């Protein structure tokens, strides 16, 4: 599968532990990408949104988001603290074919 420019930027952000600012569904988001890959042939990312806007209320401290990368615009990488939430109780269902996962070091060496 050929990777989009957005996918490559999210990949770089994971490898370099950079924050991302972007527009998703018309809302400004500030997030850290955690799991990157594909589901149903679509480029997807499980990310932790820690600031910015949302269609729903963003809880204090942030929230997990499943992003369809085709809907992401205006991606910028920046330095800053890495955020990934405190709870990892549920198995993620956002990405079926995992390319990178910050929690699985072997994927970071590909």
Label each residue range with its predicted role.
Residues 1-110:
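Short glycine- and basic-residue-enriched patches
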């Amino acid at each position: 599968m050929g990777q989009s420019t957005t996918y490559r930027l999210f990949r770089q952000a994971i490898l370099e532990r950079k924050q991302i600012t972007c527009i998703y569904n018309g809302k400004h988001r500030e997030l850290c990408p955690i799991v990157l890959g594909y589901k149903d042939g679509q480029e997807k990312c499980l990310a932790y949104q820690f600031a910015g806007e949302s269609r729903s209320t963003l809880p204090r401290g942030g929230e997990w988001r499943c992003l369809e990368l085709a809907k992401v615009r205006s991606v910028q990488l920046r330095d800053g603290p890495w955020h990934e939430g405190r709870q990892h109780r549920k198995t993620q269902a956002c990405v079926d074919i995992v390319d990178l996962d910050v929690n699985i070091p072997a994927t970071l060496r590909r």
